[in-house]
A protein has these predicted regions:
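Conserved N-terminal phosphate-binding loop of PLP-dependent enzymes in the Aspartate aminotransferase
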Residues: 1-199
Length: 199
């Protein structure tokens, strides 16, 4: 019952969402979100911005170049143990560089965009609005990783302050006040696909 109560409370804070799932850690939540998103689209490639954990989908970006993740919080991450066939499935893009992202979407057939709403930089030149629009236009699933930013400055995700709403969002850290809990929320039509895969 506590899980249901918490899910209802988080959804109450995020009216655009209608379903929630829970994990223990942020890396697990990120991997789960990617799996659910990929089950919703034929275009499995991911464009991302920011730090999103240690799972294969994320670290595979460094197969092309060990410097790919250098601008995403942690540099010099080794991809040993990551299957080489994951090469060219996840691609980083710089925050606030919409032109770069737009080219990446066309070049790499991107089906999912996963990003931190903000970390040490604020969005400029309607960056978040442009990202949301291109996701709408290209039928790309937009995931906001709010493990770090959620429930710190406001009651919910920091994306609420900008009035830009994703298809899925992830929360952790402040959500549990020190306890190991993360939440993935999303639109019903997307989250329902979790029932068709093993989670």
């Amino acid at each position: 019952p506590e899980e249901v109560l918490l899910a209802k409370q988080i959804i109450k804070h995020h009216r655009w969402a209608s379903m929630a799932k829970f994990t223990r850690g942020g890396g697990e939540a990120n991997a789960l979100a990617i799996r659910i998103a990929r089950s919703n689209t034929k275009n499995k490639n991911v464009a991302f911005c920011g730090y999103h954990g240690w799972h294969d989908w994320y670290l595979s970006a460094n197969i092309n170049s060990k410097k790919n993740l250098d601008q995403h919080l942690m540099s010099g991450l080794n991809y040993d143990g990551i299957p080489k066939n994951l090469k060219n499935t996840s691609f980083p893009f710089p925050y606030n560089d919409f032109e770069y992202l737009e080219k990446l979407i066309h070049k790499r057939n991107i089906g999912i965009i996963k990003m931190e709403v903000m970390r040490n930089l604020k969005p400029e030149n309607n960056f978040l609005k442009k990202v949301r629009k291109i996701c709408n236009d290209k039928k790309i699933i937009l995931i906001f990783d709010e493990c770090t930013s959620g429930y710190r400055e406001n009651m919910g995700g920091i994306h609420l302050k900008f009035k830009i709403f994703p298809d899925m969002a992830i929360f952790g850290k402040a959500l549990g006040s020190g306890y190991a809990i993360n939440a993935i929320i999303g639109k019903r039509k997307i989250m329902k696909k979790a029932e068709n895969t093993f989670i």
